[in-house]
């Protein structure tokens, strides 16, 4: 079930982000991960249009949108590969004709997921906050 984010979901979002990020971003330092988590908790969730996906009445993943930009799409590792990420992207596309996102170049699993969904890789650039190369990806329906 996909539903709107509620402020009471904040602990679940942070848990999902930590668990999924630990697998997807092992190349990030613990200090950067802590800074990013604080930014998500204290700023990002208040700015983003966020949608939750539940499994067995518990949050299993989320997508956070800033206009047409996917600011974050994370699914608990135990629920990955079951269509939750695809369902969240489908939901985002119901109200948008295009989406854009950035994915770390070293995150090959996510890059493959987005490519399989239909995103096209664009420019590669440096994410200055994380000091990591990232790929800009676009999708138009």
Name what the model sees in each region.
Residues 79, 83-91:
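Conserved acetyl-CoA pyrophosphate-binding loop and the N-cap/start of the following alpha-helix
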Residues 94-106:
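Conserved GNAT acetyl-CoA-binding A-motif
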Residues 86-87, 107-123, 127-132:
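Conserved active-site alpha-helix within GNAT-family acetyltransferase domains
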Residues 1-8, 139-140:
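Conserved N-terminal entry element of GNAT/NAT acetyltransferase domains
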């Amino acid at each position: 079930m996909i539903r709107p984010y509620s402020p009471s979901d904040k602990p679940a979002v942070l848990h999902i982000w930590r668990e999924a990020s630990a697998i997807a971003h092992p190349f990030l330092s613990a200090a950067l991960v802590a800074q990013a988590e604080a930014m998500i908790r204290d700023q990002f969730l208040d700015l983003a249009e966020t949608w939750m996906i539940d499994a067995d009445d518990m949050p299993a993943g989320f997508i956070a949108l800033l206009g047409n930009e996917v600011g974050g799409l994370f699914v608990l590792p135990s629920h990955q590969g079951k269509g939750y990420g695809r369902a969240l992207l489908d939901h985002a596309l119901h109200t948008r004709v295009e989406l854009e996102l950035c994915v770390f170049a070293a995150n090959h699993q996510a890059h493959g997921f987005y490519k399989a969904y239909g995103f096209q890789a664009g420019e590669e650039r440096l994410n200055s906050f994380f000091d990591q190369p990232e790929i800009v990806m676009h999708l138009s329906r």
